[in-house]
């Protein structure tokens, strides 16, 4: 029997719904979601990024509203433009501009983190190549990896910055008080040339990013460091750890 019902909400913003011709108001979503949950079904919410009238702020709003109704699962889809559709006509007329790939990743990343932090399982990010005929669109066959790799980079760098800042000042007393990240990395080299980036098997590829973009980024920005990559099965999905091999707690 049916145990999961997903709502193709697309957006909680009234203007986006109107401009996209969705034919419903946001209040219908809240009512429908409550009924689905009251009858014991598992609720899923589908959201689209980059519809007419959309913005980063509206995407964040939609993700926050999704958290309020507490679905178990969610899907995030960047808008694609297909020929012989009203959206394609708007694109041809210049009244609709598709998101760039970079913008689509940034907006989706913001939504992903809101949902993920709330414990909502994100079962799909982007479309499969078999789902569409790619046209003028932000479609990328590895869109989920682009998003999750970007999230991984942010989380890794935040931990790396904290690790480097915790080093004894005496190791680089000749340096100015306000040091750049690279200068701090050079200071770190004097004590230990290596740091370790770790994730579990499922999230391991996100350490490197799509086509190794994260590896390239860190190697370029922190040339004084040797970064090793570790698969750690004790870490939860989407959790990344940065540490020094000499760390007693490693």
Feature locations, PLM:
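Conserved non-cysteine loop/helix-boundary elements of the Radical SAM core domain that shape
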Residues: 1-79, 83-103
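Auxiliary Fe-S-binding modules of radical SAM enzymes
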Residues: 86, 94-250
